[in-house]
Structures are given as structure tokens and as C-alpha cells.
Regions:
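Basic nucleic-acid-binding interfaces
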Residues: 1-86
Length: 86
């Protein structure tokens, strides 16, 4: 599972051959969560409140790049790293 971004201790990952809808996996310490790319909604799991807000903000800022990575992943191509929040 490639890490496509890392910011404030939050690792953002996409899994090859993952199922729709397009989504990302976020990991922060012992917490794990899955977020829909199109709306930034939490699909499963949980993160602390501040980490959750940061992930949603990052998704909103990078929606186009995330969808492009999802398309690459579906084709078995290498995904690109996406800059994290600063």
C-alpha cells in the first residue's frame, strides 16, 4: 500500500486493486480511517478530531490529484506523491 502523502504525522495511502468508490486510507498513530475522495466523507474507522479535519481539508485541496492517482492505481500504474499540508 503506497503512501501518497504524509503531513502532521498522518499517512495517506491507497491500496492497489482496492474497491470503489474512490477513497483513501488515513493512518495516525494507532488510528485508521477511510475517506471518500469525492466528498471527503468518513467511510469507516476513526481519527482524532484535529487529524480528521486536516484529512478532510487535504482531500478538498487535492481532489483532482487524488482522482488521477485512483485512475493510475486502477491501471496498475505508479501513483504520484501529493504534497501534504504545511
Amino acid at each position: 500500500m503506497p503512501t501518497i502523502s504524509l503531513f502532521y504525522g498522518i499517512a495517506i495511502q491507497m491500496f492497489f486493486e482496492d474497491h470503489p468508490p474512490p477513497h483513501i486510507h488515513a493512518r495516525y498513530n494507532e488510528f485508521k480511517a477511510r475517506y471518500d475522495i469525492s466528498a471527503g466523507n468518513l467511510l469507516s474507522g476513526e481519527l482524532p478530531r484535529q487529524a480528521h479535519r486536516l484529512v478532510q481539508e487535504w482531500i478538498a485541496l487535492n481532489k483532482q490529484a487524488l482522482m488521477e492517482n485512483w485512475r493510475r492505481m486502477e491501471k496498475g500504474e505508479q501513483m504520484e506523491y501529493i504534497k501534504g499540508l504545511e
